Regions:
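Fold-independent oxyanion-binding glycine-rich loops
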Residues: 153, 168-169, 231-232, 282-283, ...
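Alpha-helical transmembrane segments and their helix-helix packing motifs
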Residues: 57-147, 158-160, 170-226, 234-243, ...
Length: 832
C-alpha cells in the first residue's frame, strides 16, 4: 500500500498517536504500520467487513437517544487499535489507581465525618447542591470501606503528550464490557498482529470484580447471589449489561424482578423468592429506591436503601457515589489528595474552575472566548457551550447567565484531543485518516481495597475530522486499546473456577419471573403473528384471484371480521385488508403484533441465541420496509408468504436451540394457549358462518390449519366436512390439530402442578375430554334431518368457544400465580 501517509493530516497543534513531531512513525506503532503497508486496500476492506460482520452476528448495539431510530444501533468499531507502549502505560495505571483510592476516601469522608467540608477544602454548595448527594445514605459504611467497586476515568492527551482527566465516572461506570467485546472482535480480525505485539489481557479486571463482589457480599454463611441491575432495554448501553451478565455469570435483572422483605432483598423467581446478597448496578443513584430517593422512579426497588443500611445487601457502587461526577470538583482534588492520602495527585485534571467562587468567576468572565462552559450538576438541560463559537451577543448573554447562577456552572479550558489513525473506505477515498480520540480507563477494587487497573480500555473516536467533542451519542465510533507488554504475555482468557461433578446445574436456579413472563408472551405473540399471517394470506390470495371462488372469499372475510382481525366496514375492502396488515395503530394488525413480539423478545435477549435474535430483527426490518401508503395487495401477499416462512424458522429455533428448562416450557405454553384460542375460535366462527359444506371454504380452512398436504395425501379427494374436522380437531398425530395442542398444553400444565404445586386445570381437561369424545358420525346420520345437523354444528361451535375462553382464563391464572406471585386465595378474590 504505497504512500500510506500521503493524505494523512499532520499538524503540530495536536499530539499524534501514530507519528512523532518529525512525522516519523513512533516505535511501538511500526509493526502495525508495516503490516498496513503490506496490505492491499481490498485486504483491509475484508478485515473491516469481518469486524462489522462480527458486530452484527454478536448483536453488539448502542442506543442513541437523540435518534428516533437509534434503538439497537450497531456498535461502531474501527479496524485499527489504539496502541500504548508499556512505558507509557505504567504512569497511567498508577495515576488511575491513585485516583480511585482518592475518590473512595472522598466518598467515605462525605458520607462520614465530612472533614474536608469542615476544613473548607471543598465548597459545601458543590456537595450539598448536587442532586446525587443522598442525605439518606449519610452514615452508611459499606463492607471493607469500599464505596467504589468499579471506577472509570475519561482521559485525553494534550499537544505535549501529557494525559489529563476530563471526567470521573463513579456511580455506574459503563464501557468495560464494550472494551472486552472490542478486544475479542479486533483480535480475530488482526490475529497475527495481536500475537506479535504481545498485547496485555483484560480478563483480570472481570475476574477481580467477580471475586470482590462475592467476598464482600453479606452472605450470612450462604453462597452469595450477585445480580446485575439494569434500567432495561432502552438504556444506551443495554447490550453491555447483557454481555457483562453473561461474562460474569450474574443474573440480569430489572427493578421489578426484586423485592425487599424485612430489610432483605429477594429475587422473584419461578420457584419463589431467592435472597440476593449483592447488586452490581447500572442504575443511577436516585432511581434505585423510590421509597427514600426519587419517588417517581419506576426502575428501582422500594426499601433497597434500608436493606443496605441494615447491612443485608451490598450495592456496587455505593448509593450516593454519583456526587463525585460533578466537574466542579476537579479543581479541588489536588488539595483533597494531599489531605486524605498525603500524596500529590499524579494524574492532573483538565484546567477546570467552578464559577461559584467569586474570584474565579471574574477570571472566567474575562476569558470566556477561550473556555468551555458546562453545567456543574447532572440533570441541568444545558449542552456544553464553546466560547469561541459565540458572537459578542452570545458571549454577553452567557456572561449574564453565569452572574445569575454562578454555582450552577463550571469553566474548562478547551481540551486539545490527540489524533489517531482510522481506516476509512468511502466517498472521500480509501486509506488512513486522522480523528480526535479520548480514552476511558477502568479500575476495579480488590477485596483488600487496592485497585487493579484494566491494561487497556475503551478508546472513543470523533465522528468527523473537525469534531470538538468525542461522544458515542453524537455518532462517534470506538477502538480497541492495546497496551503492549515488554515480554511475551501468557494466555489469559476469562478463566472460570474449576467445576466438578458437585457443581453441575441442570436447571437455572435464578430464573426471574419477568424473564419467564416475557418468554411466555414471546410464545403467544409469535403464534398470534403466524395465525394472523395465515388468515390474511387466505383472504388476500382469494381476493386478488380474479377467477376465484366467491363463496370461499365471502366465508374467509366473514371469519376475519368475526374474530376481530379486520377493521370496521366504513372503508373499501382493499384499504381494510392493508390496514389489517400494516396499520400500527390498529391493535389487531399484524404490524402491531410483530412490534409486541419484538418488544417481548427484547426483554429476554440474553436468553435467545444470536441466530434467533437476528431472525427477529430481520422480521422487524422487513415490516418497516413496507410503506403503508404505497404497498399494493400483490406486495402484501408476497410479504405474507415470506413472513410465514420466517415465523416457521423462529418456531424451529425454539424447538431445536433452546434448553428445555422452565423458561422454554412457558414459551411453549404461551404458543399452545394462543394456538388453541385462535383455532377454536376460528373453527367455531367457520361452523356458524354457513359455509361448512362448501368445498372451497373447506380448502382454505385446511390451508389455515397448515394441513392441506396431509389431507390430499390421505384422501385424494376434494375437501369434505367430516374428514376435514377429523384432521383439524380430533387427529392426535397432527401437530396442528386442536386435540394435539390441547393434550400438549395439558401435559405442560400438569408438569407445573408436579413441580410447583399449582392447582390442576380441571375445566380445561374436562373440555378436552368432551372434544375427544365428539362423534363425527353425528354429522352423517342426524336423528332429526337437516335441523338436527344444524344443532350438532351449533353444539360443536359452542364447545369450541368454551375451549377458547377457558384457554384465556388459564393464561390469566398463570400470570397471577407465576408472574405476579398472587396466591390461590388472592386469585379467587381477584377473579370475583
Amino acid at each position: 500500500m504505497p504512500e500510506l501517509l500521503a493524505h494523512y493530516p499532520f499538524t503540530d497543534t495536536a499530539y499524534h498517536e501514530l507519528l512523532d513531531r518529525q512525522g516519523g512513525v513512533r516505535p511501538h506503532w511500526q509493526r502495525l504500520f508495516r503490516q498496513l503497508e503490506r496490505s492491499s486496500p481490498e485486504q483491509l476492506r475484508q478485515r473491516q467487513a469481518l469486524v462489522e460482520r462480527q458486530i452484527q452476528e454478536n448483536g453488539v448495539t448502542y442506543n442513541v437517544y437523540a435518534d428516533p431510530k437509534g434503538t439497537d444501533r450497531p456498535w461502531a468499531l474501527d479496524l485499527l487499535p489504539n496502541l500504548l507502549s508499556a512505558a507509557e502505560w505504567q504512569p497511567i495505571a498508577a495515576g488511575v489507581a491513585q485516583r480511585a483510592r482518592l475518590l473512595n476516601a472522598l466518598l467515605a469522608d462525605l458520607y462520614g465525618d465530612q472533614r474536608l467540608l469542615a476544613e473548607g477544602l471543598l465548597p459545601s454548595e458543590l456537595v450539598f447542591g448536587h442532586p446525587n448527594f443522598l442525605w439518606p445514605a449519610l452514615g452508611i459504611r459499606p463492607p471493607g470501606g469500599i464505596f467504589l467497586h468499579s471506577y472509570a476515568v475519561d482521559l485525553a492527551r494534550d499537544a505535549d503528550g501529557r494525559w489529563q482527566v476530563l471526567a470521573d465516572r463513579t456511580q455506574a461506570p459503563s464501557g468495560a464490557g464494550y472494551a472486552l467485546e472490542n478486544r475479542q472482535i479486533v483480535s480475530r480480525a488482526l490475529p497475527e498482529l495481536y500475537r506479535d505485539l504481545r498485547v496485555q489481557h483484560l480478563a483480570g479486571y472481570f475476574r477481580t470484580l467477580q471475586e470482590t463482589l462475592a467476598s464482600q457480599a453479606a452472605g450470612d454463611g450462604e453462597t452469595p447471589l450477585v445480580v446485575l441491575l439494569t434500567p432495561g432495554r432502552f438504556n444506551e448501553t443495554y447490550f453491555e449489561h447483557l454481555y457483562l451478565a453473561r461474562q460474569l455469570g450474574f443474573p440480569l435483572v430489572e427493578g421489578h424482578d426484586l423485592t425487599v422483605r424485612d430489610a432483605t432483598l429477594y429475587l422473584k423467581t419461578l420457584g419463589g423468592l431467592k435472597r440476593v446478597h449483592a447488586v452490581l448496578r447500572r442504575l443511577d443513584d436516585d432511581f434505585c429506591d423510590p421509597l427514600e430517593l426519587r419517588t417517581d422512579s419506576a426502575l428501582g426497588i422500594p426499601g433497597l436503601l434500608e436493606a443496605v443500611r441494615q447491612g443485608r445487601v451490598l450495592v456496587a457502587n455505593a448509593l450516593g457515589s454519583g456526587v463525585l461526577e460533578s466537574p466542579g470538583l476537579l479543581g479541588f482534588l489536588p488539595q483533597a489528595c494531599r489531605r486524605l492520602l498525603g500524596e500529590e495527585l499524579a494524574l492532573p485534571s483538565l484546567d477546570t474552575r467552578w464559577c461559584g467562587e467569586p474570584q474565579a468567576l471574574e477570571a472566567i468572565l474575562a476569558a470566556l472566548p477561550d473556555l468551555v462552559i458546562k453545567p456543574a450538576f447532572p440533570g441541568q438541560r444545558c449542552e456544553p457551550l464553546f466560547g469561541h463559537a459565540l458572537d459578542s451577543a452570545g458571549l454577553a448573554s452567557l456572561g449574564e447567565r453565569l452572574r445569575e447562577r454562578p454555582q450552577a456552572y463550571v469553566a474548562q479550558r478547551l481540551a486539545q484531543l490527540s489524533q489517531a489513525p482510522v481506516w476509512r473506505d468511502g466517498e472521500a477515498g480509501v486509506g488512513l485518516q486522522s480523528r480526535a480520540i479520548g480514552m476511558r480507563v477502568f479500575a476495579v477494587a480488590a477485596s483488600d481495597g487496592r485497585y487493579w487497573v484494566m491494561p487497556g480500555g475503551l478508546t472513543r473516536v470523533a465522528s468527523a475530522a473537525d469534531a470538538e467533542v468525542v461522544s458515542m451519542q453524537r455518532g462517534g465510533a470506538s477502538k480497541d486499546t492495546w497496551v503492549l507488554a515488554e515480554r511475551a504475555v501468557g494466555g489469559e482468557p476469562l478463566r472460570p473456577r474449576r467445576l466438578g461433578v458437585r457443581d453441575l446445574v441442570r436447571e437455572d436456579p435464578y430464573l426471574p419471573s419477568r424473564v419467564v413472563e416475557n418468554l411466555f408472551w414471546c410464545g403467544r405473540y409469535a403464534e398470534r403473528c403466524d395465525d394472523h399471517a395465515r388468515l390474511l394470506r387466505v383472504v388476500l390470495s382469494r381476493y386478488v384471484d380474479a377467477d376465484g371462488d366467491e363463496e370461499a372469499l365471502r366465508s374467509a372475510l366473514a371469519l376475519a371480521g368475526g374474530i376481530g382481525l379486520l377493521p370496521g366496514d366504513g372503508e373499501p375492502l382493499e384499504r381494510r385488508l392493508l390496514r389489517a396488515l400494516l396499520d400500527e395503530h390498529w391493535p389487531a394488525s399484524l404490524c402491531a403484533n410483530l412490534r409486541r413480539l419484538h418488544w417481548a423478545a427484547a426483554q429476554v435477549r440474553g436468553r435467545l441465541s444470536g441466530e434467533n435474535w437476528l431472525a427477529l430483527l430481520e422480521l422487524q426490518r422487513d415490516m418497516q420496509a413496507l410503506d403503508p401508503a404505497r404497498t399494493d395487495l400483490g406486495e402484501a401477499l408476497d410479504f405474507l408468504n415470506r413472513l410465514v416462512m420466517s415465523l416457521a424458522a423462529l418456531s424451529g429455533f425454539a424447538l431445536d436451540d433452546m434448553t428445555r428448562d422452565d423458561g422454554w416450557r412457558f414459551l411453549m405454553i404461551g404458543r399452545r394457549i394462543e394456538r388453541v384460542r385462535f383455532f377454536a375460535e376460528s373453527i367455531a366462527a367457520f361452523l356458524d358462518g354457513g359455509s361448512a359444506w362448501d368445498a372451497g371454504a373447506l380448502e382454505w380452512l385446511l390451508e389455515l390449519g397448515n394441513s392441506g398436504i396431509t389431507y390430499r395425501s390421505r384422501y385424494l379427494a376434494s375437501p369434505q366436512l367430516v374428514p376435514v374436522l377429523d384432521l383439524l380437531l380430533l387427529h392426535e398425530q397432527n401437530p396442528h390439530s386442536l386435540r394435539f395442542q390441547l393434550q400438549a398444553l395439558e401435559r405442560s400444565l400438569e408438569r407445573l402442578h408436579e413441580e410447583f404445586g399449582a392447582p390442576r386445570e380441571r375445566e380445561l381437561r374436562t373440555l378436552g375430554e368432551r372434544l375427544r369424545s365428539f362423534d363425527l358420525a353425528a354429522l352423517e346420520s342426524p336423528l332429526f334431518g337437516a335441523a338436527g345437523l344444524d344443532e350438532v354444528l351449533v353444539g360443536l361451535a359452542r364447545l369450541l368457544r368454551d375451549i377458547a375462553a377457558c384457554a384465556g382464563q388459564v393464561s390469566d391464572r398463570l400470570g397471577l400465580r407465576y408472574f405476579a406471585h398472587v396466591d390461590d386465595v388472592s386469585q379467587r378474590t381477584v377473579s370475583t
